[in-house]
């Protein structure tokens, strides 16, 4: 195994968390609530309406191939624009739809104020700014989630959102992470960006083709133009000895096979990147898919500069994944 890569044998001990002394919400709360019915139909936000949300620092207008979307974000702890912010943690959520365009979950009952409160708690806990990045069609963002998720367009939009926020707030480096499809996006951006200090892939599919093959999803396999595979970009990941990558998963998972996550980690290790595979049998039944609390914790600790051994021990000492709405 190359230097900087490790399969984790976790030994637990309790760790106190660093606290921010003055992490204030950057985004402005409102009474807006998220609607699952709107997600099923597709969310449209006009450019002018998006400008009003931009003034509240909960949105950015992003264009790819001449078509724009109003993508939402919920932030706390940032120095006001134009910054500077030496580092900021950003989390990309997992899917909020299942196998049907009418099966929507996770965001129901939440709204802008709740998301800002969530990020404020994380910013205060870890002492660095925290942002929740809403993918197209979800958590208030415009777009049609059913047809955009997992696509090259989604990846391009989310990468462009990071660029807009980087410029707006003077972010020098990102600690970037995500759950499930958000973790897949995180892996994809390893090859697209030179400003990642941390990458946390939590219950993700960073070897997307291998995931489709393992699950026997032949319809998707027959349309490779409809998805992206971060494993195809492994040789384009820039070398950065300061960057740390954590691949977190539950070996019992039935949705994204852990072997596919292990294979991606091993490919990172073979190329000499500083990466750690973190197997945690802590996700809830029946699918063993959610480790969001663990991913957020790894992201906050890595972004705040905590040494790797303490990060791994903290994850080991945490209780099992709790029920939660946001992902």
Briefly describe each language-model feature range.
Residues 185-227:
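Hydrolase active-site cap/lid region
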Residues 66-128:
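Short, surface-exposed "cap/lid" segments of acyl-processing enzymes
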Residues 177-186:
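Gly/Ala-rich beta-loop-alpha elbow adjacent to hydrolase catalytic centers
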Residues 35-82:
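N-terminal cap/lid segment of alpha/beta-hydrolase-fold proteins
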């Amino acid at each position: 195994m190359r230097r900087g890569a490790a399969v984790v044998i976790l030994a637990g001990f309790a760790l106190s968390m660093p606290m921010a002394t003055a992490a204030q919400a950057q985004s402005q709360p409102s009474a807006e609530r998220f609607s699952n019915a709107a997600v099923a139909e597709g969310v449209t936000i006009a450019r002018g309406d998006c400008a009003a949300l931009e003034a509240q620092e909960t949105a950015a207008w992003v264009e790819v191939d001449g078509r724009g979307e109003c993508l939402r974000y919920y932030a706390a702890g940032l120095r006001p624009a134009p910054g500077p912010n030496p580092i900021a943690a950003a989390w990309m959520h997992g899917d909020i739809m299942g196998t049907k365009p009418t099966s929507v979950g996770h965001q129901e009952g939440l709204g802008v104020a709740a998301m800002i409160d969530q990020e404020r708690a994380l910013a205060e806990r870890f002492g660095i700014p925290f942002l929740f990045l809403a993918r197209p069609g979800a958590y208030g963002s415009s777009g049609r989630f059913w047809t955009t998720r997992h696509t090259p367009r989604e990846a391009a939009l989310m990468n462009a959102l990071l660029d807009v926020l980087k410029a707006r707030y003077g972010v020098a480096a990102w600690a970037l992470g995500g759950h499930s499809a958000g973790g897949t996006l995180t892996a994809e951006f390893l090859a697209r960006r030179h400003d990642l200090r941390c990458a946390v892939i939590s219950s993700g599919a960073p070897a997307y083709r291998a995931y489709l093959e393992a699950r026997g999803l032949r319809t998707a396999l027959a349309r490779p133009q409809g998805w992206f595979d971060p494993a195809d970009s492994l040789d384009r990941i820039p070398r950065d000895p300061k960057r740390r990558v954590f691949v977190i998963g539950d070996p019992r998972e039935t949705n994204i096979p852990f072997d596919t996550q292990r294979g991606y980690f091993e490919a990172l290790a073979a190329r000499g990147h500083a990466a750690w595979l973190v197997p945690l049998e802590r996700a809830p039944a029946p699918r063993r898919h959610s480790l969001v609390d663990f991913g957020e914790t790894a992201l906050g600790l890595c972004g705040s500069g905590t040494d790797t051994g303490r990060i791994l021990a903290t994850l080991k000492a945490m209780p099992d994944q709790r029920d939660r709405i946001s992902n």
